[in-house]
């Protein structure tokens, strides 16, 4: 069965560049981003992992951990990390999972479950579907899933924007409009009646249509 938004993120125990982890225990009571890449020592992936390393302080501020995954070995990850730091200017400062038996990739739907063989037998093209992103909440449920083609590097700034939205809407009964950024107006969700909205937003709201109710971003 394929994973859906709202499903519990499958737990696993795995070897990483920072030692063995139990995924759910590693997440703890915060947020996590699990992102995978098709192959070590490839150009697009090199730029991605270097860039996200530079953004780690931004994720830390949001109580969100980062963890990478590919079907390469932990030893390969460590060697490749030297190239990433040399070429991208940022040292990899988060763990990378070595999923050499393909089990995590299969569990998360990155590789067909009936695929046989080992990671050593697979090329980057074989692993083309292993360029996924999962945002996981403190309840260990999947909040966002993205799959990118091999030829397109991911926009991790957009991932921060989405994380801001997810964290805000987890606390308040609002949704965020197109291209929303922190500090901009948000939308009262339809499930909140006008009577309840008056209690939660006593200063009122802008309403160009009855079903569109805009308010300033709630403060924690």
Task: Identify the function of each model-found stretch.
Residues 1-220:
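Chalcogenol-based redox active-site neighborhoods
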């Amino acid at each position: 069965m394929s994973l859906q938004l709202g499903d519990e993120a499958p737990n696993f125990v795995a070897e990483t560049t920072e030692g063995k982890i139990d995924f759910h225990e590693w997440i703890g009571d915060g947020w996590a981003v699990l992102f995978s890449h098709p192959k070590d020592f490839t150009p697009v992936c090199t730029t991605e992992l270097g860039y996200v390393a530079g953004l780690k302080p931004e994720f830390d501020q949001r109580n969100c951990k980062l963890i990478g995954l590919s079907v390469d070995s932990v030893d390969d990850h460590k060697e490749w990390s030297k190239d990433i730091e040399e070429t991208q200017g940022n040292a990899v400062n988060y763990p990378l999972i070595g999923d050499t038996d393909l089990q995590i990739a299969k569990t998360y739907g990155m590789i067909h479950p009936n695929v046989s063989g080992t990671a050593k037998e697979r090329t980057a093209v074989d692993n083309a579907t292993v360029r996924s992103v999962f945002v996981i909440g403190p309840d260990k449920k999947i909040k966002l899933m993205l799959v990118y083609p091999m030829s397109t590097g991911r926009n991790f700034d957009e991932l921060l924007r989405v994380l801001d939205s997810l964290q805000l809407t987890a606390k308040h009964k609002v949704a965020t409009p197109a291209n929303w950024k922190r500090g901009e107006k948000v939308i009262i969700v339809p499930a909140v009646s006008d009577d309840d909205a008056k209690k939660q937003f006593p200063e009122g709201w802008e309403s160009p249509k009855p079903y569109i109710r805009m308010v300033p971003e709630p403060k924690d």
